[in-house]
């Protein structure tokens, strides 16, 4: 069983300001729920247009995004030095024990001098 939500490349872009944790916006908002309880592998794939001067891009899955119950999990920092002006597909994955009442989202942070842009983006939950 798996669920996939995606924004096609070229349909809608999202600017991510530097040095500010920002929730990635997928087609129905910033959070998604699974159909049944269990262990789910969450995967996100982002098409990132890099600006100048960055050295790190951080990504983390979060349970209960946008609420006081926020609980981060599955973090991964990527070295983006030398990627100025380039466009890359990047992905993150993490296994989360969750049920239909628990929303999950993904947020990112970067240290570039100006916003980076997300073009195509998708989030998938696959039951293990």
For every predicted segment, state its role.
Residues 19-20, 29, 67, 102-105, ...:
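Intrinsically disordered, low-complexity segments enriched in proline/serine/threonine
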Residues 21-64, 119-124:
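Beta-rich globular "head" domains
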Residues 47-109:
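Terminal beta-strand-rich extracellular "head" domains
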């Amino acid at each position: 069983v798996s669920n996939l939500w995606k924004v096609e490349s070229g349909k809608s872009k999202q600017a991510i300001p530097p040095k500010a944790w920002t929730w990635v916006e997928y087609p129905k908002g910033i959070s998604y729920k699974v159909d049944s309880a269990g262990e789910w592998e969450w995967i996100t794939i982002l098409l990132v247009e890099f600006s100048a001067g960055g050295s790190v891009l951080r990504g983390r899955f979060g349970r209960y995004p946008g609420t006081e119950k926020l609980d981060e999990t599955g973090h991964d920092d990527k070295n983006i030095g030398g990627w100025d002006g380039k466009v890359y597909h990047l992905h993150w994955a993490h296994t989360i024990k969750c049920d239909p009442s628990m929303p999950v989202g993904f947020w990112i942070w970067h240290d570039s001098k100006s916003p980076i842009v997300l073009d195509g983006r998708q989030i998938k939950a696959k039951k293990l």
